[in-house]
């Protein structure tokens, strides 16, 4: 439960850190899971609270699950096409199937709503608020919408880790995105297919893949 977690977090701060004279706080891991957690870490969740949110966001859950199944199987035109992405512009993706935009918009709204409460709490105490986020082209998939977060933060530090082969590192997270979504007959495709998919993905981003 998001609200319960927020309340617990702020209670911990008040019990152990309030009054120590901090000038500000730095918020990290303010996101949903990434593809480094596998497809299951991204294609979730379907608890009652999330089901209600899907309805509020106008998401056809049956169609969403169907499209998720097609990605898992590498069917329905996905295959080497990462989630059927057709365009990228200033941190936002366009997909061949509109359910994905609604799905990721819902995630972004959830993160922003939680952070509005948390950042408001600290700003009311005269404290600065900083945020750690994924690199912009990856942040989208974790529910981090920079345009939504910017008004709440005094500064944002995107993790532009160009050579880090570990979670949050750009090459690592990109490889996980490609590996998990480029599939055929329910299994991950070989290196040649992933290389082609990676090249196509970077072409959509409008940049060169340096490996």
Task: Write out the residue ranges for each language-model feature.
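Polysaccharide-binding and catalytic clefts of secreted carbohydrate-active enzymes
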Residues: 1-155, 159-210
């Amino acid at each position: 439960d998001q609200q319960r977690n927020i309340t617990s977090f702020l209670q911990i701060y008040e019990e152990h850190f309030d009054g120590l004279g901090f000038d500000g706080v730095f918020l990290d891991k303010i996101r949903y899971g990434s593809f480094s957690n596998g497809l299951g870490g991204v294609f979730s969740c379907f608890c009652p609270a999330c089901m209600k949110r899907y309805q509020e966001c106008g998401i056809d859950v049956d169609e969403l699950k169907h499209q998720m199944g097609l990605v898992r199987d590498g069917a329905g035109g996905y295959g080497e096409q990462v989630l059927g992405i057709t365009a990228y512009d200033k941190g936002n993706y366009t997909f061949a199937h509109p359910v994905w935009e609604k799905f990721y918009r819902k995630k972004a709204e959830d993160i922003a709503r939680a952070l509005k409460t948390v950042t408001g709490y600290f700003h009311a105490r005269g404290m600065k608020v900083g945020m750690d986020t994924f690199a912009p082209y990856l942040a989208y998939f974790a529910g981090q919408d920079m345009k939504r977060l910017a008004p709440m933060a005094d500064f944002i530090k995107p993790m532009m880790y160009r050579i880090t082969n570990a979670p949050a590192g750009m090459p690592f997270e990109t490889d996980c995105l490609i590996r998990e979504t480029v599939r055929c007959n329910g299994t991950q495709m070989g290196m040649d297919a992933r290389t082609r998919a990676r090249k196509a993905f970077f072409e959509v981003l409008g940049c060169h893949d340096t490996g």
